[in-house]
Amino acid sequence: MTVRRDHMMKKNAKLWLVVVVGAAALVLSACKAKSPAPPSGQSSGAGSFAAEEGRENTGSTTNPPEAAQAPEAAQAAEGQAAKSRLRPRLEDDYYEYVNWDILSETRIPGDSSSWSYLYQLDQDAYATLDQLLKETVKKRPSLEMGSTEQKIADFYRTALDEEARAAAGLGGLAPYLESVRSAATIPQYLESLAGLRRDLGLASLINVQKTEDLRDSSQYVYYFFQPDLGPGKEILEDGTMGSFLDEYQSYIGRVMEYSGMEPGDAGKAASEILAFQRELAAATLPLSRRQDPDVYYNPYTAAQLQQLLSNVDVPAYLDALGIAGRDFYVVTDVKALEACNDWLTEDHLELLKNYTVFSLLSDMSLYLTPQMQGNALAWHNFQNGIAEMKAADKLAGEMTQSMFGFEFGRLYAEQSFSEEDKENVTAMIRQILAAYKKRILALDWMGDETKANAVKKLDSMTLKVGYPDHFTDIHAAARITPPEEGGTLIGNVLALMRAETAFDLEEGKKPVDKEKWAMTPQTVNAYYNPSGNEIVFPAGILQEPFYSPEADLATDMGGIGMVIAHEISHAFDSSGAMYDEKGNYKMWWTEEDLENFRALAGKVADYYDGQEGFEGRFVNGEQTLGENIADLGSLSCITSIVGDDTDGLRALFTRFATIWASKYTDEAMIRRLNTDVHSPAKVRVNAVLCNTDAFYLAYPQLREGDKMYLAPEQRVGIW
């Protein structure tokens, strides 16, 4: 899983919604992390084992879109229908064969869009930390003001206080909203955008975030990413999503009403905002191309930016952001930024202001009045086919755990991961690295010079297991006000966002901290960071069924071994392979070997293009290429460790299929096919097994005509 560093997503508020919607990057989308990538799904080459898929948000709502109905009855009927069918032969559907019982008996929780072992582990981590949270709240009278425990307890208490949220209205967000609405000129509008980014880290039209420089990973650089496209380019341009976009327009209208607009004006604004996002989407790169550093790494000096953004006073804007004076900046999507510039004219000012008001309130609605929060959560539930609203205390708990992720992560690591576990997993990583090195040296399509460089990259790889050695308090400057002193949820959220953004701005002036983690210890995922040439395995994923110190080698190889090898493979996928052993985007291939690699990658993309993901909708082979290369490479590597032990191979394949057992609502599946860089779980099992030679050794009964059989000359793979 590459944990694609979601700098391409908006920070803070939207990031929390992403986290609660899924903490399992390993499974569906994140395998690489921390390389400059564009927001909202733009990838830099970082890879994660899975896509986000843990906690989901729900809440009360006013006039929400209809959610899925009668989940228990529908799922019960589905379960009975499944049981009435026969378990498929392993020769025809290995994923269903192994997971038949669990998939027949397990129901998607009513307040979630999915169930999986990743989801279950995420819920287990939440429960562990929720107990600590409740104990902290009980101790509140004795806690010292300004301590981490006080901040956590009082944040949670304000998150639960509906009356205070209702009374606060927009709270401290109101001045930012007024700054946007009162802008009488484009320069004044841009000044309001700069204030939102500088103070809170929020962006709408011009999205600037810092991350490592691709060509010098020891330094930070500021990247101009794509603008806020709501549900994203892929959905905005999907001709089958008409009814979905109708609901999205209704959601925009409700947000604009909550901003103070009359219903008729809000409806008109909603129509214009959606049309505007579609116009912007037409100018932006598709997800499949946002993973190519050659495409998204475009350095511009401030003077060159001025030519690109002719309707912006670039020096003044950079100064207002606090990032003036850099040698260069990086534009990830030149045509998208050109399109933004074209819209920055006085005749579009009202549209631009409405667009930013919507973007701001959509980001922040979770922390505002019960009605606004309910509207946001109801829209989220509609998008993902979630039938039930989440209990208020669980919602507040998830919000608190997410906002204080590393603070809770330190406590989780202390309780749930031992030094012995860390040593065991580290030893397994080294064993897999050795096997990977052996496989690279045996490749017949790669020359000696490139092999030597690949081995150097493996030997230089940094291993991070369980939890960071040091925890940095990025919220040290934040004052969390207790309810008794008039503290409100929105006020405390803004305090945290200001502290994080100020910390981020100061961090950008220093060399990159190579000890920093992009995931909290409790996250149920893993990632490869190409800019650090590092593989990272949080304690949250180092639990059963992925890892057990009591399991035999083959079984653990099929679980955590597959995760480890997957992340290592990201160092050599279609994007990660372009980074050297120091994490710099630098060519270390011979021309001939690179041509061979790209030819093999093309075959992988073509193969996955033919894989059905869900009811006539197919996997996008280019969009998922990096993750598919990592899946194929990981299984080839770990099976080489088990060798020709057929019993061991069967145990490995069984555990491999087991860890991917999952169920999704129809809506969630469709969205994932559009917006995820990972293939669906069933494809990740069956398609990979069909292309793995050891699978045929373990199950010699496989024959031509079986659905799990693929002739040797048709099998694809690289590593």
Give residue spans per PLM region.
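Zinc-dependent metallohydrolase catalytic domains
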Residues: 150, 188, 194-198, 426-561, ...
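Short, low-complexity, disordered segments immediately C-terminal to signal peptides
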Residues: 32-64
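Sec-exported extracytoplasmic/periplasmic mature domains
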Residues: 95-103, 130, 134-138, 161, ...
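Second-shell loop/turn segments in exported
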Residues: 80-84, 115-116, 179-180, 232-241, ...
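Active-site-surrounding "flap" and adjacent substrate/cofactor-binding loops of secreted or lumenal enzymes
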Residues: 89-93, 97-160
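Noncatalytic, helix-rich "gating/capping" subdomain that lines the substrate-entry/channel surface
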Residues: 134-427, 431
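Bacterial N-terminal signal peptides that target proteins for export
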Residues: 7-17
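C-terminal motif of bacterial Sec signal peptides marking the signal peptidase cleavage site
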Residues: 27-30
